[in-house]
């Protein structure tokens, strides 16, 4: 997909070598690329051309007053009626930059009145809150991040500062809330600040959970609004990583993916990354010390899918990538890359003339004759790609995939039902298993060749492949020499460990799919729609969960799986005594045993209350290992338990529900096996 086109240069070493930053600006429907070099250099303007080479448009050597003080930054800002290419100027007292004329050429050197942090700038971002325009600037020397009102005459008024540094900065609005996101390579900090609606000052939002991703030396930061969400992508140089997080309305960052560079990709020691959205599809381009660039796309749930990489050649000039810019021009992505070693700008292209639709659904989902991205929903789904180079993504339930003609990518989902691919073309199609946790090479899979294809098994996952030609398939035919693309690290280790153990609630509980459920903290929620495979999600520590069910009425059965926390101490030796009393024909010490007591007493779940149950409960109480770990069970509160006796402990867990537009509530009874209490 990545096509090398050419290297463009002016012929002046001061303008072509040591390019530190690039920026794009469109005037009157024409897009211009601005490149800046460091001290002793200047600015070059290239006019982008649909289907052709960029044309030299203008240049400007840095004037003598700033020539030896300029850093690598070249960022676009609008000050009043003027557009400015702002620079990092070491000893300046105001913000310095060159005015940009509406024909794309470079105008006069400008400097604002003095601002508290001066003009030694490492990152900046401009945004609006209501009718007020703001500029937030990271000032290197002063060690703080300042926020300024941009007045109508182009002057800056300081409204506040927060301590810290940033090498990358972006702004994003989620609903009515405006946020500034920063990244700093020195302390590995990813910070989110909300903007006060009245004063414009920045207030930091606690996002310490992002530290679990292991992002080291973040060098690039991008935001994008896509698929109905706001996303933050961070590239880490020392961690050789690209991370995707969803920015929620309250300013919290929720990790969705964490991809690591491999021998097959080219974003090791990543220095820059750009994200662009085209017709509902998100593309990511990244590169750095790995002498090349990698192209990825992002799914509607924030996962990165590998598309292609381009490695440096003797002609291309991208050894040690420094900066990247991506523009959508005509039917192409035009990618411009500057190197720390080579002069000029390298132009790569990606053709988008066959870009199709992004479609997510249940039942039968049909693509077009172009390059579609089809995602299965939460119900059993049949994805039919048709012609084109399609991406087909498995859902949470059973998924059947038919790629059709073209080079298709079949993306598996961990924790789904059986996935069947009906027309896999070895050597043309690709099977992407990046969602399978800790999977690094095909040798970890169990691949069984069948008469018409192959069966692939990993942990509890199964993929049935039927070859397009009807013949058998081997692991080598499916995967070649190994997996393509980056490795992915789980952002939620609950997928490996299952539901966490935490305290619960005994007795009547109401399960609300739209709110907190204290009795369901850290539990696994399993919903089986009528006629479909089960759907499973894990609740958070407040018992909140989202099954992501489709609109309309959906009847089914809900069950809950919750482990016992030994730290709670709810099961004691007295519980073992109560069970032993029941087993020998006596009642508990408080009187006759209720049906709920008998269910709790039968911890072995063999249908009777006996001495083995008492022994298992005693082992739990004193901390000894047992073959029968306690767990919570949840029953329909209206269930008839009158037939339960000590020799007939027969019951059904869960409850029938009818979800309406994805929501339901149901009254249940929560019972901890092994815990015998008066009801």
Named regions from a protein language model:
Residues 352-414, 418, 456, 473-479, ...:
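Glycine- and aspartate-rich repeat motifs characteristic of hemolysin/RTX-like Ca2+-binding segments
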Residues 274, 407-493:
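Acidic glycine/aspartate-rich repeat arrays in secreted/surface proteins
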Residues 1-361:
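Feature marking well-ordered beta-strand scaffolds used for ligand recognition
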Residues 25, 49, 71, 101, ...:
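A structural detector for beta-sheet-dominated domains
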Residues 341-361, 367, 479-501, 661-679:
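A recurrent domain-boundary module in secreted/ectodomain proteins
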Residues 494-679:
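Cellulosome-associated attachment modules in secreted, modular CAZymes
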Residues 30, 81, 131-132, 177, ...:
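Calcium-binding loop positions in Ca2+-binding modules
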